[in-house]
Amino acid sequence: MAAQQDIRIKLKSYDHTLIDKSAEKIIRTVKSTGAVVSGPVPLPTEKKIYTVLRGPHVDKKSREQFERRHHKRLIDILSSSSDTVDSLMQLELPSGVDVEIKV
């Protein structure tokens, strides 16, 4: 019998709906193997604002702002088994979600 291990999964994405759907998919998969799940915990959103001039010549007062939001979620899996790890490896997530797994 394999030792039980704790797994921490960090999800990052620019789209909050995509990251929430991915988190629900992971939780459904893990709960089907019988492991205990804590989360998803929403972590602070990183917001980066870029300010650029609208025109190439004059009108310094005319500017435009763009922002990039980086959403993050944290999922802890407690008392996992080898079946849990296998099911997580088989899971397919959308390409817009970055997954970081720590055992």
Curated annotation (Swiss-Prot):
The UniProt record lists the keyword Ribonucleoprotein: yes
Gene from which the chain derives: rpsJ
Family named by the database record: Belongs to the universal ribosomal protein uS10 family.
Subunit structure: Part of the 30S ribosomal subunit.
InterPro entries named in the record: Ribosomal_uS10, Ribosomal_uS10_CS, Ribosomal_uS10_dom, Ribosomal_uS10_dom_sf
SUPFAM superfamilies in the cross-refs: Ribosomal protein S10 (SSF54999)
GO molecular function: structural constituent of ribosome; tRNA binding
Ribosomal protein in keyword set: yes
Assigned keywords, A-Z: Ribonucleoprotein, Ribosomal protein
Entry-linked PANTHER family: 30S RIBOSOMAL PROTEIN S10 FAMILY MEMBER (PTHR11700)
An example Gene Ontology biological process: translation
GO CC list: ribonucleoprotein complex; ribosome
Function: Involved in the binding of tRNA to the ribosomes.
Organism: Salinibacter ruber (strain DSM 13855 / M31)
Name listed for the protein in its UniProt record: Small ribosomal subunit protein uS10
UniProt-listed Gene3D superfamilies: Ribosomal protein S10 domain (3.30.70.600)
